[in-house]
């Protein structure tokens, strides 16, 4: 299950970036939101020079799985 509707539509790094920032808005506190926004920005910068489309799709899939795990973690705590 994806953290937000529309995860299956994510095809490009920019779409992934926007999707993950929207996920961050769903987190419970401002501090947690800022922490994960920073992590998203850092990861985007680290992988910005990636040009292998297969690798990009792997990154997108893994990022959505990680976002799902994080969202479930904070849903269980509340």
Swiss-Prot record:
Disulfide-bond pairs as recorded: none
The name this protein goes by in its record: LYR motif-containing protein 9
Gene this protein is translated from: Lyrm9
Lineage: Eukaryota, Metazoa, Chordata, Craniata, Vertebrata
Family indicated by similarity: Belongs to the complex I LYR family. LYRM9 subfamily.
Organism in which the protein naturally occurs: Mus musculus
One Pfam family cited in the UniProt record for this chain: Complex1_LYR
CDD domains: Complex1_LYR_LYRM9
């Amino acid at each position: 299950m994806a953290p937000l509707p529309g995860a299956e539509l994510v095809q490009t790094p920019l779409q992934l970036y926007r999707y993950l920032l929207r996920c961050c808005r769903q987190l419970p506190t401002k501090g947690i939101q800022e922490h994960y926004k920073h992590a998203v920005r850092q990861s985007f910068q680290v992988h910005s020079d990636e040009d292998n489309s297969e690798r990009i799709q792997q990154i997108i899939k893994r990022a959505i799985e990680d976002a799902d795990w994080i969202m479930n973690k904070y849903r269980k705590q509340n």
